[in-house]
């Protein structure tokens, strides 16, 4: 299709009556936000993605393929709609209306910004990122998160090219663009228009090949995405002073361990985690220890598993070296606690909230479990392997408590549900231990 045919029905709209007219009668609406940092955070480009440090600049809406309107709310130039009128109108007409399906690409993002305004998206809703990950990208492989961006899906599935944020903004924030500039309008409108097109395309695919997946997207994954946005917005309250205090204690402990290691091996550079080439050369060339494991590039491995194997070998053949490996393993443990959990968590403490707001990804693992990133708050070390007390950094807000819950044997339980194996079902129904029942066979 020509560029004219793709973008000819996009327009900027600031009149509430015209906005209402455009949406009238539609039972499915796609929407997308453009955001920009608040004045105090303009030196951080990533702040535009943070609902605590940025604001909604405008919203685009699409009710028919090839058609969309852009409603500017907080542009410096070109004029804006009255947000005090538009936001309540869209809240009632779209976001909380049970008669309208709300479509967005990355619904968690939109949910987070609406929650900042006191609005929680109500079903029915549809996240096209979730839908993308529930479809096959080839005959044997489902799409991953990296395959599910709008700018990647549109050329692949619809054969069109979308304007990029960088091309349109040229290093500026979105609120610095003229709200009525055709390129501004084209960029903003394309996101909601193509979210709606993908919604239709994915549903056609589901209906033809995997109808159950459409049900899952509409009734499980998309509502979950809304609450992922809420959870990200709320974040985790962190004891930052305690983290800084422990950071110093860890640094002192690492220095102490490094000095003890140096007393055994001299001036060999062990680096931050005893994984340097110099240390490996010392182990395998100077000490002439056996290479028990190699890397993918056929080099000597020196990971935790390898060091454990070497320590066991030395206990039998070179017992005088066992204390060295004990020190190195202790050094690595403290190094990981400091770099991954203390230094790593401190980098993500939001200056506006004093909290960490990780991304929560419901479909990012092959097992179906949630994943988290920026940072990964799901892999806090167990207390038995944590002399620092990392989990104690996470605080309950005043008047609240933290509750730890865990599914019991969830994968096997799901397997029993689907395969209907009589013995597995009986074990669960009688409160037995499925692992004990398996090993007794």
Regions found by a protein language model. Give the residues of each.
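A short, basic-hydrophobic beta/loop patch
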Residues: 74, 426-437, 441
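Conserved "right-hand" nucleotidyltransferase catalytic core of DNA-directed polymerases
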Residues: 1-74, 141-145, 153, 157, ...
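Cytochrome P450 catalytic domain signature, combining two hallmark sequence patches
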Residues: 123, 289-294, 419-430
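Acidic beta-strand-to-loop metal/phosphate-binding motif
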Residues: 30, 99-107, 402-404
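Phosphate- and divalent-cation-binding pockets in alpha/beta enzyme and binding domains
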Residues: 109-116, 282, 414
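Nucleic-acid-processing active sites and adjacent nucleic-acid-binding tracks
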Residues: 64-102, 438
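Conserved beta-strand -> loop -> alpha-helix junction used to position metal-binding or nucleic-acid-contacting
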Residues: 120-137, 150-151, 431-435
